[in-house]
Amino acid sequence: MADRDRSYRTFDQVVRGDRTNYQSGPSTTQVLTVLTLLPIGGTLLALAGLTLTGTVIGLCMATPLFVIFSPVLVPAAIAVFMAVAGFLSSGAFGLTGLSSLSYVFNRFRQATGTEQLDADRAKRGMQDMVGYVGQKTKETGQTIENKAHEGGRT
């Protein structure tokens, strides 16, 4: 049995039939892709290394200053944080108060029925405006017509 050479079919041969797909190497597109991206990737990696180095050096130089000035910096940071939180919360409370007053005012208007009067007044105003625009349109049309007749006479 050991003297007999068995031929095993590969996965590609099973899937594609008995056709074998011989490739001698990477395609031209793959080679160009690698040649294009290798310098770009190397440059970006070098820039990342320089950035990391600069950050570590800056941190090493600034750490003693942070330790020395921490009795001043920490309370100052806390004070700034509390001031910003105070301004933001006062703004939120103001908006909440305005929306509450608006809600109460609208509920009061609905209860007294004054909103129907406001709606009727708005309808009359719109009707008056439509009538005014219609009248102005007629006047403008007559003016243009008169000018056209005058231009035709001369």
Curated annotation (Swiss-Prot):
GO biological process, one term: seed oilbody biogenesis
Membrane-related topology note: Multi-pass membrane protein
InterPro entries (alphabetical): Oleosin
Annotated region described as Hydrophobic, given as residue ranges: 34-105
Domain of life per record: Eukaryota
Polar: annotated span: 2-33
N-acetylalanine carried by residues: A2
Protein name as annotated: Oleosin 16.4 kDa
Family: Belongs to the oleosin family.
GO cellular component: membrane; monolayer-surrounded lipid storage body
Organism name: Gossypium hirsutum (Upland cotton)
Function: May have a structural role to stabilize the lipid body during desiccation of the seed by preventing coalescence of the oil. Probably interacts with both lipid and phospholipid moieties of lipid bodies. May also provide recognition signals for specific lipase anchorage in lipolysis during seedling growth.
Keywords, comma-separated and alphabetical: Acetylation, Lipid droplet, Membrane, Transmembrane, Transmembrane helix
Subcellular location: Lipid droplet; Membrane
Keyword Acetylation appears in the UniProt entry: yes
Ranges that cross the membrane: 31-51, 65-85, 86-106
